[in-house]
Amino acid sequence: MEFETVIGLEIHAQLKTNTKIFCACSTQYGAAPNSHTCPICLGMPGVLPVLNKKVVEYSIKMGLATGSRINQWNQFARKNYFYPDLPKGYQTSQFDLPIVEGGHIEIEVDGVSKVIGITRMHMEEDAGKLVHDDVEPVSHVDLNRTGTPLLEIVSEPDMRSPQEAYAYLKKVHAILRYLDICDGNMQEGSFRCDANISLRPMGQEKLGTRTELKNMNSFKNVQAALEYEVRRQRDLLLEGEKVIQQTLLWDPDKNRTEAMRGKEDAHDYRYFPCPDLVPIEISDEWIEEIRASLPELPEQCKARFIVDYALSEDDAVQLTSERDLALFFEEVVAAGAHPKKSANWIMTELLRELGGESIVDCRVQASQLSALLLMVDQGMISGKIAKTVFAEMMAEGTDPQLIVKEKNLLQVSDEGELLAIVDEIVAANVQQAEDFRAGKTKLMGFFVGQLMKKTKGKANPGLANELFNKALNK
């Protein structure tokens, strides 16, 4: 029997505000445990929350960027449950009156475009964090994160494969980063994702029993967890067993999911309107003001790169997948490097050297990479030497001109100097020279290689080919 995979994602994006959603405590990551707390964060009796206006503004920005409807009358609600990292016994969230509804995200997988619907986005406060002791069988509670503003983005169950879910997650991440409302750091927990997944017989409309996947702290883990859960549910169904509705944790060390608890429904949380916060009313004027302030988004940036820099669509897609990468590319070009050559170097040499790290952590500045590419264009160094220089730039952050000077790597373009070596090589390889003249033109690589050995890779390759052609065709 064939099954269809149905996936919906719930993305929790920490909004990049200086203070928390309902109090003036800092949202700084990495502070000493429980140092950024106050009676409001901790849910002490008699305190009242005050809504951070920036949280509303950032939520509207994301709604506008995804073609969603902004609910100009929305309301906070209490989501009631007990957990050690939730000191109030409830989370202030939104339920039946969220700030954003509808909208969509367009993704592309294997060259095929698809629109993924958005159900809703709502504002809420983050919970604290449990830190499990490596030695003692205890867990410590850090409440610094409590009250950090979150925007939860809930998709429609429109994804039909882990690959589509991965593409959707990356696209949402990119939009948040372009809007500069979330830093998107999955390792620090500022961009988190839960997945609801079920299988149903191909052609059936009714959804199957779903499970919820948690603890996926990287894009790679999201795809791996979804692929595992698809296989697990398919195996159960093929064996005639039932899928149990439950919450599962992904264990990246064991590459498998483990049961956490039964999956809750909305009624389990006993939502009711928050009595401490009045409903929010958003004016048309404020929405239009925010709309006018929206920056260029990934799709717009991609279209501009194709037109302004004559890049292919594939190159433009890759360069605009991350806001910082797009900015780096434009800085390289602005410093004088050729757009296409800049794109090629960034997508091959630079990304390979980074090895999955963010461009923000790159030790090479855009102006330095531009200077290196200009040295190649001007014939000062060869492309091969440039790769060696670039590796040292990545390691030390040194200017390319200094590396080339200190290591005496300037390209040899003196025709007289090279011609003497060319004649010497031809004279020493009589048989290869005769074979070349007989039609084995691929031997040109052999001759140029000999020249590169003698010049330690510094010979101008274009001039080398020209000189060998003359010498071998006398």
From Swiss-Prot:
Per its record, the protein catalyses:
L-glutamyl-tRNA(Gln) + L-glutamine + ATP + H2O = L-glutaminyl-tRNA(Gln) + L-glutamate + ADP + phosphate + H(+); L-aspartyl-tRNA(Asn) + L-glutamine + ATP + H2O = L-asparaginyl-tRNA(Asn) + L-glutamate + ADP + phosphate + 2 H(+)
Q: Which biological process terms from the Gene Ontology are attached to this UniProt entry? A: glutaminyl-tRNAGln biosynthesis via transamidation; translation
Give a yes or no for keyword Ligase in this entry.
Answer: yes
InterPro entries registered for this protein in UniProt? Asn/Gln-tRNA_amidoTrfase_suB/E, Asn/Gln-tRNA_Trfase_suB/E_cat, Asn/Gln_amidotransferase, Asn/Gln_tRNA_amidoTrase-B-like, GatB, GatB_C_1, GatB_Yqey_C_2, Gln-tRNA_amidoTrfase_suB_CS
Which GO terms of the molecular function aspect are on file? asparaginyl-tRNA synthase (glutamine-hydrolyzing) activity; ATP binding; glutaminyl-tRNA synthase (glutamine-hydrolyzing) activity
What HAMAP family does the annotation carry? GatB
Q: What does this protein do?
A: Allows the formation of correctly charged Asn-tRNA(Asn) or Gln-tRNA(Gln) through the transamidation of misacylated Asp-tRNA(Asn) or Glu-tRNA(Gln) in organisms which lack either or both of asparaginyl-tRNA or glutaminyl-tRNA synthetases. The reaction takes place in the presence of glutamine and ATP through an activated phospho-Asp-tRNA(Asn) or phospho-Glu-tRNA(Gln).
What family is it from? Belongs to the GatB/GatE family. GatB subfamily.
Q: What is this protein called?
A: Aspartyl/glutamyl-tRNA(Asn/Gln) amidotransferase subunit B
Q: Could you tell me the gene encoding this protein?
A: gatB
